[in-house]
UniProtKB/Swiss-Prot annotation:
Name the UniProt record assigns to this protein: Large ribosomal subunit protein uL4
Family (UniProt): Belongs to the universal ribosomal protein uL4 family.
HAMAP family membership: Ribosomal_uL4_B (MF_01328_B)
GO BP terms: translation
Protein's gene: rplD
Keywords: Ribonucleoprotein, Ribosomal protein, RNA-binding, rRNA-binding
A Pfam family: Ribosomal_L4
Gene Ontology annotations for the cellular component aspect, listed alphabetically: ribonucleoprotein complex; ribosome
Length: 207
């Protein structure tokens, strides 16, 4: 499958052949894409929510009042879950929300996400993702030429430092090396910009 190579000025400068098994899958599996996104989001959760149990709450262990003769329900501790200021029963604990997902499924998810963007015409190949200076205003003017609301930029094995610094202060613009390419960011952003180097490395990686 052939597609245009664009410059950062959004002008056609050549043509590139994309591997159809990676960028033009015939049937897009939305279920696989969702599965990978759910796996990513669960893995990203910190899981540091926690409440104190009866044994962890600070306070006295003294019996609040005698067992019989007061007319009240019997109580053994002021730290019990039914008492104000007591512990919490079955509350959230510190844990990992991460689940397991086979590498083959994760790889398939990336392939189908790239194919979906390509089918929508929102995957663009750029000849070079390099800037002379780390100027945000320069990069904003460049991205405005593509008329998109959000951009996920994937470079080769290394990201240009000037491009990376310029993109830091731009809302909904993320730049990563090819190893950082992921399903969630591909789907979340309107446009995916790939450098020529990123295309060749991704094709080798996902083959």
């Amino acid at each position: 499958m052939k597609t245009k190579i664009l410059s950062l000025a959004n002008e056609e400068v050549g043509e590139i052949s994309l591997n159809e098994d990676i960028f033009a899958v015939e049937f897009i599996r939305d279920d696989i894409i969702k599965q990978v996104i759910d796996w990513q989001r669960a893995k990203a959760m910190s899981g540091n929510h926690k409440t104190k149990t009866v044994s962890e709450v600070l306070g006295t262990t003294k019996k609040p009042f005698k067992q019989k003769g007061t007319g009240n329900a019997r109580q053994g501790s002021l730290r019990s879950v039914q008492m104000r200021g007591g512990g919490v029963a079955h509350g959230p604990r510190v844990r990992s929300h991460a689940t397991k997902l086979p590498k083959k499924v994760r790889k398939l998810g990336l392939i189908h996400a790239l194919s979906e963007k390509c089918a929508e015409g929102k995957l663009l190949v750029i000849d070079s993702l390099k800037l002379d200076k780390p100027k945000t205003s320069v990069l904003v003017n460049i991205l405005n030429k593509f008329q998109g609301k959000s951009f996920f930029v994937i470079d080769g094995n290394e990201v240009d430092i000037n491009f990376s610094l310029a993109a830091k202060n731009i809302y909904n613009t993320v730049i990563v090396p090819q190893i950082g390419a992921n399903v969630y960011d591909i789907i979340r952003h309107e446009y995916v910009l790939l450098s020529q180097e990123a295309v060749s490395v991704l094709e080798e990686r996902l083959r």
